[in-house]
């Protein structure tokens, strides 16, 4: 039947490609289109003459009744499509499995690699050279090893090239993003090829093959072909990721980066000397990621959905916020609180009340002088030049307000500063609304810097409102944990309506009256959420899905609290969202954004 080869695509390759496209759609960025499109062009042009030679030499044949008819340089159109669809499928597997990774961290081995990485690269290069030479030998010898030789001599020089330029990076990556995206599509295509060979859709002529089968009727040469080509695709994707990581991680090398880096920038990153890499910045990014993973599972999951320099700056912003919070929160006296907040205010003054470029050395000297070593990277790499100042000052003010629970005078309003709903809202504005505003400021800067002022103001306001909503959920979740620390964020006026005092909540943080107040706080949170959520659709598309995903994962905590009052799964008194439900929430948000 003339449609046999076409049916292979209709039954096996196109459905898989479609499924992977649907799965990957929410995280797809224009950078991914650039990567996949470039690899498809390269693979098509590299495979075309080689495949044409195989057919013209009668090594590979297609029964006339198995193909539709149109050919290019003797290659059936179905085979040409295979070049494209295989590259697309394997690239999608790579993207999906690599998305959680933060690639800039893997640049740390480029200048002075560990011995195992340096040795691994040399061994890998040696293996690829040996396979290439063996392939050449088989071609020269002719006979049964010809086809295998043609595969090895064609594929592995390309693999050697990519491994030479990115071997250290590839070896540093986890196996889940290198070996796994090679193995899964390879095994799948082995099974497809086994079916096609069994049906006679294509054939390898006897006399040019060894006659060994991996299983069934799958010739060892065909198995080697799919393995080798998928290695090429994954190596090619890794090369792209290395160059993109260089572009995004080092502002001193690439001060301005468009939404999609240009081909010229990729070339420039290729020829950047590793001595120019700012490894201190990479170490700072590593510290920031460690803070993020340890302190906020929801934000860590959401952050992996962002791309490029925006993702980096969001991580650095979070690291600063967490560091400032910890410095104040870990203080042992009111004097120490005042000392840290004064230093943080002065740090911000140096950025916003003086010429930053002229005072860069002064800022770094002040960081070294005033802060402990573990705090330096979070302060040094805060992207202050593209952040508004007012939310940062207000954030520190919020941390000061928090400290009143531990260090206060004898009055009740000083010991429990959340005296009424206005004070609660103000506190939420300080510690969470500001963070929402800062995140949106980064999104606008990286995704749509030309955004009209009116829309900017609207998004800033919406982000503040949503930040307060999330903080209310946080307070509702942590009533027990906060009470253990002597803190009560429920407004004192609300407590009086239930016949309680803050001391009652500290002593007995569970019970009917406290649950009534939890419900009330969640109700206020969802009112703010309902007000702000529709307006979040005005966020630039590249960041809309991840931003909404971050919001929804946190609001899901509130939904769990509402659904399972008195019976929620607790972790030190905190309601948790099961991992599967959290993932489902993120995916729903991404698809609907």
Curated annotation (Swiss-Prot):
<dbReference type="InterPro" id="IPR044843">
    <property type="entry name" value="Trans_IPPS_bact-type"/>
</dbReference>
<feature type="transmembrane region" description="Helical">
    <location>
        <begin position="77"/>
        <end position="97"/>
    </location>
</feature>
<protein>
    <recommendedName>
        <fullName>Bifunctional lycopene cyclase/phytoene synthase</fullName>
        <ecNumber>5.5.1.19</ecNumber>
        <ecNumber>2.5.1.32</ecNumber>
    </recommendedName>
</protein>
<dbReference type="GO" id="GO:0016117">
    <property type="term" value="P:carotenoid biosynthetic process"/>
</dbReference>
<feature type="transmembrane region" description="Helical">
    <location>
        <begin position="147"/>
        <end position="167"/>
    </location>
</feature>
<comment type="function">
    <text>Bifunctional enzyme that catalyzes the reactions from geranylgeranyl diphosphate to phytoene (phytoene synthase) and lycopene to beta-carotene via the intermediate gamma-carotene (lycopene cyclase).</text>
</comment>
<keyword id="KW-0472">Membrane</keyword>
<keyword id="KW-0511">Multifunctional enzyme</keyword>
<comment type="pathway">
    <text>Carotenoid biosynthesis; phytoene biosynthesis; all-trans-phytoene from geranylgeranyl diphosphate: step 1/1.</text>
</comment>
<dbReference type="GO" id="GO:0016020">
    <property type="term" value="C:membrane"/>
</dbReference>
<feature type="transmembrane region" description="Helical">
    <location>
        <begin position="31"/>
        <end position="51"/>
    </location>
</feature>
<keyword id="KW-0125">Carotenoid biosynthesis</keyword>
<dbReference type="InterPro" id="IPR017825">
    <property type="entry name" value="Lycopene_cyclase_dom"/>
</dbReference>
<keyword id="KW-0413">Isomerase</keyword>
<dbReference type="InterPro" id="IPR002060">
    <property type="entry name" value="Squ/phyt_synthse"/>
</dbReference>
<feature type="region of interest" description="Lycopene beta-cyclase">
    <location>
        <begin position="1"/>
        <end position="242"/>
    </location>
</feature>
<comment type="similarity">
    <text>In the N-terminal section; belongs to the lycopene beta-cyclase family.</text>
</comment>
<keyword id="KW-0812">Transmembrane</keyword>
<dbReference type="InterPro" id="IPR033904">
    <property type="entry name" value="Trans_IPPS_HH"/>
</dbReference>
<dbReference type="InterPro" id="IPR008949">
    <property type="entry name" value="Isoprenoid_synthase_dom_sf"/>
</dbReference>
<keyword id="KW-0808">Transferase</keyword>
<comment type="pathway">
    <text>Carotenoid biosynthesis; beta-carotene biosynthesis.</text>
</comment>
<feature type="transmembrane region" description="Helical">
    <location>
        <begin position="117"/>
        <end position="136"/>
    </location>
</feature>
<dbReference type="Pfam" id="PF00494">
    <property type="entry name" value="SQS_PSY"/>
</dbReference>
<dbReference type="GO" id="GO:0004311">
    <property type="term" value="F:geranylgeranyl diphosphate synthase activity"/>
</dbReference>
<dbReference type="GO" id="GO:0051996">
    <property type="term" value="F:squalene synthase [NAD(P)H] activity"/>
</dbReference>
<feature type="transmembrane region" description="Helical">
    <location>
        <begin position="8"/>
        <end position="28"/>
    </location>
</feature>
<feature type="transmembrane region" description="Helical">
    <location>
        <begin position="169"/>
        <end position="189"/>
    </location>
</feature>
<feature type="transmembrane region" description="Helical">
    <location>
        <begin position="231"/>
        <end position="251"/>
    </location>
</feature>
<dbReference type="GO" id="GO:0045436">
    <property type="term" value="F:lycopene beta cyclase activity"/>
</dbReference>
<dbReference type="GO" id="GO:0016872">
    <property type="term" value="F:intramolecular lyase activity"/>
</dbReference>
<keyword id="KW-1133">Transmembrane helix</keyword>
<comment type="similarity">
    <text>In the C-terminal section; belongs to the phytoene/squalene synthase family.</text>
</comment>
<feature type="region of interest" description="Phytoene synthase">
    <location>
        <begin position="249"/>
        <end position="593"/>
    </location>
</feature>
<dbReference type="InterPro" id="IPR019845">
    <property type="entry name" value="Squalene/phytoene_synthase_CS"/>
</dbReference>
């Amino acid at each position: 039947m003339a449609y046999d080869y076409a049916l292979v695509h209709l039954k096996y390759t196109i459905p898989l490609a479609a499924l992977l496209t649907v799965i990957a759609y929410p995280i797809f960025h224009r950078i991914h289109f650039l990567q996949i499109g470039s690899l498809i062009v390269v693979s098509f042009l590299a495979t075309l003459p080689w495949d044409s030679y195989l057919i013209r030499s009668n090594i590979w044949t297609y029964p006339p009744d198995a193909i539709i008819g149109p050919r290019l340089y003797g290659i059936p159109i179905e085979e040409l499509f295979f070049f494209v669809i295989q590259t697309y499928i394997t690239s999608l597997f790579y993207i999906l499995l690599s998305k959680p990774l933060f690639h800039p961290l893997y640049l740390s081995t480029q200048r002075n690699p560990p011995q195992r990485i340096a040795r691994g690269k040399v061994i890998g290069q040696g293996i690829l050279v040996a396979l290439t030479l063996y392939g050449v030998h088989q071609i020269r010898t002719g006979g049964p090893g010809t086809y295998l030789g043609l595969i090895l001599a064609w594929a592995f020089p390309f693999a050697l090239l990519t491994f030479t330029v990115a071997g250290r990076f590839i070896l540093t990556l986890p196996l889940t993003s290198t070996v796994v995206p090679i193995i899964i599509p390879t095994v799948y295509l082995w099974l497809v090829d086994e079916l096609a060979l069994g049906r006679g859709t294509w054939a390898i002529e006897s006399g040019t093959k060894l006659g060994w089968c991996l299983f069934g009727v799958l010739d060892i040469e065909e198995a080697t072909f799919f393995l080798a080509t998928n290695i090429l695709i994954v190596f090619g994707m890794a090369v792209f990721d290395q160059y993109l990581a260089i572009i995004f991680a080092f502002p001193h090398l690439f001060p301005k980066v468009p939404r999609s880096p240009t081909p010229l920038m990729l070339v420039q990153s290729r020829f950047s000397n590793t001595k120019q890499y700012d490894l201190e910045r990479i170490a700072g990014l590593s510290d920031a990621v460690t803070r993020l993973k340890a302190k906020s599972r929801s934000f860590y999951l959401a952050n992996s959905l962002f791309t490029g320099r925006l993702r980096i700056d969001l991580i650095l912003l979070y690291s600063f916020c967490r560091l400032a919070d910890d410095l104040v929160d870990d203080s042992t006296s009111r004097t120490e609180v005042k000392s840290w907040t004064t230093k943080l205010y002065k740090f911000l003054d140096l950025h916003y009340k003086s010429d930053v470029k002229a005072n860069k050395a002064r800022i770094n000297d002040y960081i070294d002088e005033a802060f402990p070593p573990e705090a330096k990277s979070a302060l040094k790499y805060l992207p202050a030049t593209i952040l508004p100042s007012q939310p940062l000052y207000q954030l520190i003010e919020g941390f000061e307000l928090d400290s009143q629970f531990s260090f206060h005078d004898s009055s009740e309003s000083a010991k429990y500063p959340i005296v009424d709903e206005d004070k609660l809202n103000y506190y939420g504005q300080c510690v969470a609304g500001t963070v929402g505003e800062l995140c949106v400021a980064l999104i606008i800067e990286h995704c749509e810097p030309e955004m009209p002022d009116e829309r900017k103001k609207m998004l800033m306001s919406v982000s503040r409102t949503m930040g307060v909503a999330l903080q209310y959920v946080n307070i509702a979740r942590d009533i027990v944990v906060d009470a253990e620390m002597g803190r009560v964020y429920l407004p004192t006026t609300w407590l009086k309506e239930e016949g309680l005092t803050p001391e009652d909540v500290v002593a007995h943080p569970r019970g009917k009256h406290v649950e009534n107040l939890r419900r009330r706080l969640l109700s206020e949170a969802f009112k703010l959420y309902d007000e702000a959520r529709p307006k979040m659709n005005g966020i630039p598309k590249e960041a809309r899905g991840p931003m909404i995903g971050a919001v929804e994962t946190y609001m899901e905590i509130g939904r769990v609290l509402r659904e399972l009052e008195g019976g929620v799964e607790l972790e030190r008194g905190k309601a948790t969202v099961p991992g599967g439900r959290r993932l489902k929430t993120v995916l729903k948000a991404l698809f609907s954004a």
